[in-house]
Amino acid sequence: MTENRQLGALLAACHWIGEKGWCPATGGNMSLRLDLAHCLITESGKDKGSLAAEDFLLVETANNHVPSGRTPSAETGLHTLLYRLYPEIQAVLHTHSVNATVLSRVERSNALVLQGYEMQKSLSGQRSHLDAVVIPIFDNDQDIPVLAQRVAAYADNRPLQYGFLVRGHGLYCWGNSVVEARRHLEGLEFLFQCELQRRLFDVNSNVDVKPNVDVNPNVEAK
């Protein structure tokens, strides 16, 4: 019964993500842990806004084997890696939003640091806007096992929290339930949009643009 409720919650989250436009053109993938050895993940090439329960495939987390023989998402290995690394993770959401895609390219370092935003508290455990939330950025790679190795190497030295970005690709985020994963996704997307807007304003504020009219309120019109 719990599994059915969680899958229902994940389907609702997928439809909501589709409405947001965060997984265009069948992009992205979503998964749900069943137990320590298995998860459900979206089948390759499915529109996330119109998914049904039968569009989720059973996968063995130890080796990415799909008993049904159907084709899961190409990035299944990143989902199963997260389930192996962190037993508390119950759901993983991977989206391709414009904000995540652009920010991951604009930020040249290996992490996006979010600080000063009240909405950081949408992320579990965050208590103050003064703290820094670090979202790692990994260079994109079509070889998913290689990309998974880089993520695992990072996690060996510093625990992953909330999510990570793949440069020019999108966001992976998770939670200890579908509800928490969805909240983390919504919170991070809001923070990404704020950060992108802030950077755009910073760039524009450095451009010397002279107004075409005199806007001094103390000057009388002639």
UniProtKB/Swiss-Prot annotation:
> Which Gene3D superfamilies did the record assign?
Class II aldolase/adducin N-terminal domain
Source superkingdom: Bacteria
Task: Tell me the Pfam families matching this sequence.
Answer: Aldolase_II (PF00596)
Q: Which residues bind Zn(2+)?
A: H94, H96
Pathway(s) where this gene product acts: Amino-acid biosynthesis; L-methionine biosynthesis via salvage pathway; L-methionine from S-methyl-5-thio-alpha-D-ribose 1-phosphate: step 2/6
Please name the GO terms that the record assigns under molecular function.
methylthioribulose 1-phosphate dehydratase activity; zinc ion binding
What are the names of the required cofactors? Zn(2+)
User: What is catalysed by this protein?
Assistant: 5-(methylsulfanyl)-D-ribulose 1-phosphate = 5-methylsulfanyl-2,3-dioxopentyl phosphate + H2O
Q: Which GO terms describe its cellular component?
A: cytoplasm
Co-factor: note? Binds 1 zinc ion per subunit.
Which biological process, per GO, is one annotated for this protein? L-methionine salvage from methylthioadenosine
What stretches pass through the bilayer? none
Q: What is its EC number?
A: 4.2.1.109
* EC supergroup of this enzyme: lyase
Alphabetically sorted, this entry's keywords are:
Amino-acid biosynthesis, Lyase, Metal-binding, Methionine biosynthesis, Zinc
Keyword Metal-binding belongs to the record = yes
Keyword hit for Zinc: yes
Q: What does this protein do?
A: Catalyzes the dehydration of methylthioribulose-1-phosphate (MTRu-1-P) into 2,3-diketo-5-methylthiopentyl-1-phosphate (DK-MTP-1-P).
Q: Family per UniProt?
A: Belongs to the aldolase class II family. MtnB subfamily.
Know the name of this protein? Methylthioribulose-1-phosphate dehydratase
The organism's lineage is: Bacteria, Pseudomonadati, Pseudomonadota, Gammaproteobacteria, Enterobacterales
